[in-house]
């Protein structure tokens, strides 16, 4: 390896001025042009030596060094031709380009020399000097122009002088800028890098024969890939084009790969791509490709070829030593012979004889091979098929027929084979899709590239030949794919069109499947373009798919604008179609919802399964029967926008839909309107309210007592409904929300009995005939009020509203039974306790209508008056009740139980009730006395468990019952002055009077032993009844003692 210095004029350090060759008289520039370049030269290799590695020398030393180098190079040129070749290469390069590397390559001809050269250019693409030059010129022009404007009135000769001065200043600034740019470029070239980081490189194929010419120009881009060939060479692939280079030595290959990887790395860093702003300076080299056709064929050679181009006429050929090479030569020669003769007049023997004469060898053993190859060539010799005006479909034969290609106006050739070479690479523009014709080939990924190639050729006014081996499978598939995308055809339509023009096509099964897939991809792209297409007038008038997609409802702002617009149209007296129907439909829906809210659904506790039961109708409705209210978002909303064609359109953020004037109602809307219409036609049905009352009726055995009770019941009922009842019921609602009351825990032993409910006590057989049936009277409807926000169950301001889950009372939680309960207050049943013997007790139900509601203020005052009475009677009633229980236990040692409870004691699950305590009839039977006894005493069980002080009474029904029973007991006690019998008071008796009767009987007969069950009263009503009965018992005992005395 030796150091070679080559004199180059113009030098690499030339300025980046225009290429018109402006002469510079500056001394520095002349010095810069007189520079040389140094290379490391080896056998077939020349590497540039960067100027930064050379120590700086003075001008005299540089001249001496250059002269000595020239003399030494002239003496060494006789021994090596590398310096001469480098010198000739410099004449081909531009003055701004740098020769990075040059390696010698192998050639098919012994007398041919080929070099692979890497040339680079430092491009000033930042535009810094141009912008600086423009800025300086503008600054000076404005500055001088301003000063000239101020002095223009003084002398007319001044503007001319100023104008000359401005031009002179601009020229000087331009020259200074050029000098600065030249210095920068010189420095960049000397450092072998660009200050802006933009260095572009390319591969040049140079042929050094009788004259030095350019045969190949390949830009080095970001997608450049380098692969080793495995045979002492390497391949470079750029923009789907592959070129093979084989250096003459291992050292040359090593030097070439090192330099090639360096420039490829810079291309990736700067992201150079094809058809980009980079490498525009290569056009000058492409215009200067002047090598011979044989040299061009060698530069564009491809690997793994089965069918190669014919050799050049001047190529020296020897007899092929092997059979494969012989067959290859036979193929090429056979084509030439068949093209030169008339196939209608000659035979196959004549063709074989001509072939033996040309090859000068006996081809007897290749007879079958020659016949088969002749048939193949005959199939390929058909003229190319014209599929479209700019697309021809042919075979290998058509691609090798130069005259035919030129006659058809073909300048672009699409080669869809791997085994066939490009026959005329310098004459036509080739695009290679190197695939085999088998079922594993993925041809689909190339169809977009082939479509762009054919489209570009059509735009340039050229025609394209698409060929493969026979023009049957691979090339036919490419043309079909192009037809589907270019003309938006379906797969079958494109296939039939191509087969109609060229009947011999037959793509393999794999290619057909890929074509069907490609058709689906094109359909998807069509829909995408249709969605992204601008909303033209035709789209606005389209009524297809004019439905709002989920999530495409109008925004709140559009809804507000729509409402404002509808209000404005309503005030103007213009009602759009369908709005009046919507208004009436909304009105009917609101009426139906109000009527549904009046239906109160209440849970209930039922009576046990006894012989007598209260049977009623269930007036509640389940939620399944209620029509759900449609949300506002489900209603169709449109932002009406009038169009120029008289139609209305809905304008949203993502779409514009046509609004039909008469849109048919949906099935859901029709069903909803029908249900609302039926709800309006339903008659007013009785609704259970909180004012329904429980009335207990009793009957006595004595005829005189029962006879006198017929008129008293009606009279007392009328009186209770007029004055006494209204005054006492008004005090029910006087409950303070913050007041804490005590309530005993109620347990009920009940069993479900359908929709019936109430308290049923088993009477004696003598009383069953006189027992009356329950009468159900519906109460008239009244306007309900909404509950107060801070109201608790039991206050007066929400007595008529629906129960809420979040209310402070326990109404909702306690109503979990499935049957209806008659909630209300117990009527005043027995006003006096004059009867000594009560034989039977029965309970019936009858609602009372026409009761006044009262106000909270009035009832509070009346409630305070009765509070003192309750507190005073509480302790006395408890003591009297305990005494009565002890006396009953002494009197009745044995109990008669029902058949169901006689066998074994049963543990009944206590069920909570929100109105009163219900007990099984087997526990309330008359079993405290002997069968022969005339006294029927019923004793309730008493339990000592109490709830917390802050436990409230749930519902206004309990409050009504408690207060009214308390008042009824007070009235009954006052009317019954001092007797133990209830003379003239009627046959009705409450549970409280029964307890008082028991207590009275026990006190009157202390010696008679009685046994009773102690039970907790069902509610504070029964508790207060205990107080009343105890007080009446004490009064009767005192009167008896006074009479006896």
From Swiss-Prot:
GO terms for cellular component: apical part of cell; cytoplasm; cytoskeleton. Gene3D superfamilies: Homeodomain-like, Protein tyrosine phosphatase superfamily. The active site is at 468 (phosphocysteine intermediate). It catalyses: O-phospho-L-tyrosyl-[protein] + H2O = L-tyrosyl-[protein] + phosphate; O-phospho-L-seryl-[protein] + H2O = L-seryl-[protein] + phosphate; O-phospho-L-threonyl-[protein] + H2O = L-threonyl-[protein] + phosphate. Changing residue 468 to S: Abrogates phosphatase activity. InterPro entries: DEK_C, Dual-sp_phosphatase_cat-dom, Phosphatase_SSH-like, Prot-tyrosine_phosphatase-like, SSH-N, Tyr_Pase_AS, Tyr_Pase_dom, TYR_PHOSPHATASE_DUAL_dom. Residues 586-601 have a biased composition (Basic residues). It is found in: Cytoplasm, Cytoskeleton. Residues 1-20, 149-174, 560-569, 602-625, 764-774, 1008-1021 have a biased composition (Polar residues). Keywords: Actin-binding, Cytoplasm, Cytoskeleton, Hydrolase, Phosphoprotein, Protein phosphatase. The modification Phosphoserine is found at residue 719. Protein phosphatase which regulates actin filament dynamics. Dephosphorylates and activates the actin binding/depolymerizing factor tsr/cofilin, which subsequently binds to actin filaments and stimulates their disassembly. Required for axon growth. Belongs to the protein-tyrosine phosphatase family. Tyrosine phosphatase activity has not been demonstrated for this protein to date. This is Protein phosphatase Slingshot. The gene is ssh.
């Amino acid at each position: 390896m030796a150091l070679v210095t080559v004199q180059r004029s113009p030098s690499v350090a030339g300025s980046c001025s225009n290429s018109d060759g402006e002469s510079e008289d500056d001394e520095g520039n002349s010095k810069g042009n007189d520079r040389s370049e140094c290379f490391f030269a080896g056998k077939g290799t020349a590497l540039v030596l960067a100027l930064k590695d050379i120590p700086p020398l003075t001008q005299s030393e540089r001249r001496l060094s250059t002269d000595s180098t020239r003399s030494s190079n002239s003496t060494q040129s006789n021994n090596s031709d590398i310096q001469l070749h480098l010198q000739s290469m410099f004449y081909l390069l531009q003055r701004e380009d740098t020769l990075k590397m040059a390696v010698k390559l192998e050639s098919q001809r012994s007398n041919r020399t080929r070099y692979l050269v890497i040339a680079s250019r430092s491009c000033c693409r930042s535009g810094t000097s141009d912008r600086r030059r423009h800025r300086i010129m503008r600054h000076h022009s404005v500055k001088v122009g301003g000063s000239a404007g101020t002095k223009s009135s003084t002398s007319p000769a001044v503007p001319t002088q100023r104008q000359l001065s401005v031009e002179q200043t601009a020229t000087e600034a331009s020259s200074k800028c050029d000098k600065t740019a030249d210095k920068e470029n010189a420095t960049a070239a000397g450092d072998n890098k660009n200050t802006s980081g933009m260095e572009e490189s390319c591969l040049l194929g140079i042929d050094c024969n009788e004259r030095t010419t350019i045969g190949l120009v390949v830009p080095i881009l970001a997608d450049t890939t380098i692969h080793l060939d495995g045979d002492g060479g390497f391949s470079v692939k750029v923009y789907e084009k592959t070129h093979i280079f084989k250096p003459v030595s291992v050292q040359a290959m090593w030097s070439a790969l090192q330099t090639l990887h360096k420039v490829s790395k810079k291309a990736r860093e700067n992201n150079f791509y094809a058809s980009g702003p980079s490498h525009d300076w290569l056009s000058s080299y492409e215009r200067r490709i002047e090598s011979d056709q044989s040299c061009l064929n060698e530069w564009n050679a491809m690997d793994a070829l089965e069918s190669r181009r014919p050799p050049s006429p001047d190529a020296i050929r020897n007899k092929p030593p092997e059979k494969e090479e012989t067959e290859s030569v036979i193929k090429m020669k056979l084509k030439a012979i068949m093209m030169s003769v008339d196939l209608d007049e000659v035979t196959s023997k004549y063709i074989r004889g001509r072939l033996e004469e040309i090859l000068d060898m006996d081809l007897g053993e290749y007879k079958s091979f020659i016949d088969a190859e002749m048939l193949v060539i005959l199939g390929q010799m058909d003229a190319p098929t014209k599929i479209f005006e700019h697309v021809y479909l042919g075979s290998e034969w058509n691609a090798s027929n130069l005259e035919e290609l030129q006659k058809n106006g073909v300048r672009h050739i699409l080669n869809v084979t791997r085994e066939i070479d490009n026959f005329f690479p310098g004459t036509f523009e080739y695009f290679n899709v190197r695939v085999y014709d088998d079922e594993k080939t993925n041809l689909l990924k190339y169809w977009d590239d082939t479509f762009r190639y054919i489209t570009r050729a059509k735009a340039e006014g050229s025609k394209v030949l698409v060929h493969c081996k026979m023009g049957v499978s691979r090339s036919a598939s490419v043309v079909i794919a192009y037809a589907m995308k270019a003309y938006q055809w379906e797969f079958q339509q494109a296939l039939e069109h191509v087969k109609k023009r060229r009947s011999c096509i037959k793509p393999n099964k794999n290619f057909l499947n890929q074509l069907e897939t490609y058709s689906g991809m094109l359909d998807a792209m069509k829909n995408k373009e249709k969605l992204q297409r601008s909303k033209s007038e035709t789209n606005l008038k389209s009524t297809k798919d004019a439905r709002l997609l989920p999530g495409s409802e109008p925004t709140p702002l559009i809804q507000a604008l729509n409402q404002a617009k509808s209000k404005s149209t309503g005030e103007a007296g213009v009602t759009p179609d369908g709005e009046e129907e919507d208004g009436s439909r909304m009105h009917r829906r609101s009426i139906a919802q109000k009527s549904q809210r009046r239906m109160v659904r209440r849970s209930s506790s039922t009576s046990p399964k006894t012989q007598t039961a209260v049977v009623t109708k269930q007036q509640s409705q389940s939620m399944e029967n209620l029509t759900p209210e449609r949300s506002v978002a489900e209603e169709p909303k449109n932002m009406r926008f009038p169009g120029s064609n008289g139609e209305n359109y809905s304008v949203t953020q993502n779409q514009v839909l046509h609004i039909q004037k008469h849109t048919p109602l949906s099935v859901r809307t029709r069903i909803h309107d029908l249900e609302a219409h039926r709800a309006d036609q339903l008659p007013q049905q009785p609704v259970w309210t909180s004012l329904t009352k429980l009335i207990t009726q009793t009957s006595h055995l004595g005829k005189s007592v029962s006879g006198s009770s017929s008129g008293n019941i009606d009279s007392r009922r009328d009186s209770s409904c007029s004055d006494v009842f209204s005054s006492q019921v008004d005090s029910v609602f006087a409950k303070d929300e913050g007041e804490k009351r005590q309530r005993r825990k109620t347990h009920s032993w009940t069993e479900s009995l359908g929709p019936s409910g109430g308290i049923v006590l088993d009477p004696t057989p003598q009383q069953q005939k006189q027992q009356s049936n329950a009468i159900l009277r519906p109460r008239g409807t009244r306007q309900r009020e909404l509950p107060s926000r801070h109201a608790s169950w039991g206050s007066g301001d929400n007595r008529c509203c629906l129960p809420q889950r979040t209310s402070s009372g326990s109404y909702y939680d306690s109503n979990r039974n499935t049957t209806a309960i008659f909630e209300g207050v117990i009527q005043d049943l027995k006003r006096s306790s004059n009867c000594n013997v009560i034989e039977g007790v029965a309970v019936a139900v009858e609602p009372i209508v026409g009761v006044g509601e009262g106000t909270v203020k009035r009832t509070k005052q009346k409630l305070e008056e009765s509070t003192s009475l309750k507190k005073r009677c509480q302790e006395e009633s408890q003591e009297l009740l305990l005494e009565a229980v002890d006396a009953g236990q002494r009197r009745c040692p044995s109990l008669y139980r029902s058949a169901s409870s006689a066998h074994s004691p049963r543990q009944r699950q206590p069920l909570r009730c929100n109105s009163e305590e219900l007990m099984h009839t087997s526990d309330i039977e008359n079993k405290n006395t002997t069968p022969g006894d005339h006294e029927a005493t019923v004793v309730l069980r008493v339990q000592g468990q109490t709830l917390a002080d802050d436990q409230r009474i749930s519902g206004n029904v309990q409050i009504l019952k408690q207060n009214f029973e308390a008042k009824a007991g007070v009235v009954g006690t006052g009317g019954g002055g001092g007797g133990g019998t209830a003379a003239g008071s009627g046959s009705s008796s409450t549970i409280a009077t029964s307890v008082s009767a028991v207590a009275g009987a026990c006190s009157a007969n202390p010696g008679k032993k009685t046994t009773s069950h102690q039970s907790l009263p069902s509610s504070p009503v029964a508790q207060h009844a205990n107080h009343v009965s105890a007080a009446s018992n004490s009064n009767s005992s005192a009167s008896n003692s006074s009479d006896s005395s």
